[in-house]
């Protein structure tokens, strides 16, 4: 038995003509009976068979015939007179069909020759190896289950238009193995996180997606209207305040993996709809959180990829090494050593320097900014993108951390960290502020900033203050950006690569 070289006929005809021809074939199928049958049940998947029989040679398969029923999308077809081959792809991988008129009947064979790439087909038969050693199904029954009306992209060029890959992700998944691998890794990552949290005795919960008051983060919300209650509502920007209400209620370890929505810009790192994991643990602080977060990310990499050493954009990254820890000013002086302690403590100098670096210091967020906020802005301009290796930036100023517990020893500083890897923020956590009077005062300060024009400043949440007044135990809480973590683990340069259906402008 000789196999032809695996090639795909060049598609010369106009796509509309191809679609018209396929619709004609579908009409003929309808005339024959059920065009889209749903009575075939596979017994095996391609990857399962490839793994199970990887060591079985041609003679072993002939001596022990193994019957299978397999279905999938036809990706290649080679018709050679009285013997033909088809490569069929299911959700796990690919396997080859071997088709002859003697085995499936002349009528079925003639029909098969008219089937198109992209059609969903099914076969029953026995496994064997071809002369080239490829595991194949020698078909004794062959059926067309679903007619594809649109042609797949050319095999050798694939789906080259990046926006089209995002807009028609279903096609991208069909023709691009790397895309399928990315989303399998995403699923493994989330499964690993869930197991890690469960093993640490955290309870998974679900909190509201519609909020009467947006809170838990500094962000601009999406606004909607609840018709039955006749009230303005907001898609949640963060679940934090609800999760901490649960800590008050006595659930001492909780987490949630879900969507947040922020009506802000789109960039390689930002999508208005994104997935976060937030967790809260009573009787912990931000140092415990850093240790826990480091272990969680390391384990997620091992579970998703089989190793803690990864490649990201051509550079190696070892997540098994201890993560670095720096304060904001330490990071600035490490990556921009020209700045002196005196300059970093000079409000006027920092404003002038930020302006020189292109930051608009006249925007509302900078109106009454103190040293801490200005230092943070300088850090973002000079050091953040340099944090390639995992680094916890610690001890954030109170004025930019309205929900974090203040340090007992350093005035103006909170027990807060942000984790950066490859220059991107991956996590944000802190010892929680559980003093209701301090929290109320910080909310009032946020309201003043909002009234001054800062759209991202927080609202005053009276019910959350009431919850704190019942007493919240000392608590640590952290949020991890799932999308950015998956970007890291899958070597994806943009967040759109790890979202199945990213937001795009309306199609013309």
From Swiss-Prot:
Entry's Gene Ontology molecular function annotations: ATP binding; lysine-tRNA ligase activity; magnesium ion binding; tRNA binding
Ligand binding (Mg(2+) 2): 425
Catalytic activity: tRNA(Lys) + L-lysine + ATP = L-lysyl-tRNA(Lys) + AMP + diphosphate
GO annotations of cellular component type: cytosol
Record's subcellular location: Cytoplasm
Residues reported to bind Mg(2+) 1: 418, 425
EC number of this enzyme: 6.1.1.6
Organism: Burkholderia multivorans (strain ATCC 17616 / 249)
Family: Belongs to the class-II aminoacyl-tRNA synthetase family.
GO biological process: lysyl-tRNA aminoacylation
Annotated CDD domains: LysRS_core, LysRS_N
Aminoacyl-tRNA synthetase found in the keyword field: yes
Cofactor binding note: Binds 3 Mg(2+) ions per subunit.
Keywords annotated in UniProt: Aminoacyl-tRNA synthetase, ATP-binding, Cytoplasm, Ligase, Magnesium, Metal-binding, Nucleotide-binding, Protein biosynthesis
Main location (coarse class): cytoplasm
Protein name: Lysine--tRNA ligase
Cited InterPro entries: Aa-tRNA-synt_II, aa-tRNA-synth_II, aa-tRNA-synth_II/BPL/LPL, Lys-tRNA-ligase_II, Lys-tRNA-ligase_II_N, Lys-tRNA-synth_II_C, NA-bd_OB-fold, NA-bd_OB_tRNA
Subunit structure, interactors included: Homodimer.
One Pfam assignment: tRNA-synt_2
Cofactors (names): Mg(2+)
């Amino acid at each position: 038995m000789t196999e032809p070289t695996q090639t795909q006929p060049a598609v010369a005809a106009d796509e509309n003509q191809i679609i018209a021809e396929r619709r004609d074939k579908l009409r003929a199928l309808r005339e024959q009976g059920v065009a889209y049958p749903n009575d075939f049940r596979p017994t095996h998947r391609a990857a399962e068979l490839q793994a199970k029989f990887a060591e079985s040679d041609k003679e072993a398969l002939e001596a022990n015939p193994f019957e299978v029923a397999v279905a999938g999308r036809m990706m290649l077809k080679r018709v050679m007179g009285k013997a033909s081959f088809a490569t069929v792809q299911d959700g796990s991988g690919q396997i080859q069909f071997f088709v002859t008129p003697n085995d499936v009947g002349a009528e079925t064979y003639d029909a098969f020759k008219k089937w198109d790439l992209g059609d969903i087909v099914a076969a029953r038969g026995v496994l064997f190896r071809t002369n080239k050693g490829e595991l194949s199904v020698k078909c004794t029954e062959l059926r067309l289950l679903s007619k594809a009306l649109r042609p797949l992209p050319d095999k050798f060029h694939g789906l080259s238009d990046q926006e089209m890959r995002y807009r028609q992700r279903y096609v991208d998944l069909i023709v691009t193995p790397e895309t399928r691998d990315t989303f399998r890794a995403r699923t493994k990552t989330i499964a690993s996180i869930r197991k890690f949290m469960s093993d640490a005795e955290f309870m998974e919960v679900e909190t509201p997606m519609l909020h009467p008051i947006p809170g838990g983060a500094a962000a601009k919300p999406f606004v909607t209207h609840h018709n039955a209650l006749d009230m303005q509502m907001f898609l949640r920007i963060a679940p934090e305040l609800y999760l901490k209400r649960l800590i008050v209620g006595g659930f001492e370890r909780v987490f949630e993996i879900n969507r947040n929505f922020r009506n802000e810009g789109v960039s390689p790192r930002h999508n208005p709809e994104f997935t976060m994991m937030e967790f809260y643990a009573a009787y912990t602080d931000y140092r415990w959180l850093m240790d826990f977060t480091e272990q969680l990310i390391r384990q997620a990499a091992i579970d998703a990829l089989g190793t803690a050493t990864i490649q990201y954009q051509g550079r190696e990254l070892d997540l098994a090494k201890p993560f670095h820890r720096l304060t904001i000013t330490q990071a600035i002086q490490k990556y921009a050593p020209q700045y002196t302690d005196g300059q970093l403590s000079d409000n006027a100098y920092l404003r002038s320097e930020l302006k020189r670096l292109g930051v608009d210091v006249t925007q509302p967020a900078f109106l009454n900014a103190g040293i801490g906020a200005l230092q943070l802005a300088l850090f973002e301009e000079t050091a953040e993108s340099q944090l390639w290796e995992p680094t916890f930036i610690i001890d954030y100023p109170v004025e930019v951390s309205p929900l974090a517990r203040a340090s007992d020893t350093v005035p103006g500083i909170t027990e807060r960290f942000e984790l950066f890897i490859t220059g991107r923020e991956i996590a944000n956590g802190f010892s929680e502020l559980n003093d209701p009077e301090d929290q109320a005062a910080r909310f009032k300060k946020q309201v003043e900033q909002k009234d001054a024009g800062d759209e991202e400043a927080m609202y005053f949440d009276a019910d959350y203050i009431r919850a704190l007044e019942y007493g919240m135990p000392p608590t640590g809480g952290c949020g991890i950006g799932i999308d950015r973590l998956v970007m890291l683990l899958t070597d994806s340069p943009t967040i759109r690569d790890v979202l199945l259906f990213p937001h795009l402008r309306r199609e013309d």
